[in-house]
């Protein structure tokens, strides 16, 4: 098993800390935030429509905490960390693409409302990079 390579430290630390922080913020999110996040996700993923918003936010937060921690742990291989990040960010990119208000009509370029979510594309790129450099 291969472990963390020094050349991957900057991307793993920056991305891991960012995702971990986002998860911790969501973990303590209020009902208003839960409704907003749930509504966006349920629009792209209909299977979430029947899930209570607060439960959805808590599960999303737990996922972010797990992925962020995985990236930060030095004994987790690049392949495993990359797989976790690719799966997680791939789901976010899919949501971005399925939500018309987030990107310009007929384009993948973000609208002002979509800029915050469009950053998930670079996380997908980092995840794929970790997968090809195990």
Spans of features found by a protein language model:
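Membrane-interface extramembranous regions
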Residues: 1-66, 73-134
């Amino acid at each position: 098993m291969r472990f963390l390579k020094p050349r991957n430290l900057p991307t793993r630390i920056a991305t891991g800390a960012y995702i971990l922080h986002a998860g911790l913020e969501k973990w303590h999110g209020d009902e208003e935030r839960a409704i907003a996040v749930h509504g966006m996700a349920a629009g792209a993923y209909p299977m979430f429509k029947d899930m209570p918003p607060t439960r959805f936010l808590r599960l999303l937060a737990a996922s972010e905490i797990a992925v962020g921690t995985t990236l930060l742990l030095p004994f987790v291989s690049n392949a495993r960390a990359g797989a976790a990040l690719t799966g997680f960010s791939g789901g976010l990119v899919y949501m971005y693409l399925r939500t018309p208000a987030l990107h310009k009509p007929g384009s993948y370029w973000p609208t002002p409302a979509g800029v915050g979510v469009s950053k998930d594309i670079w996380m997908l790129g980092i995840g794929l990079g970790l997968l090809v450099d195990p």
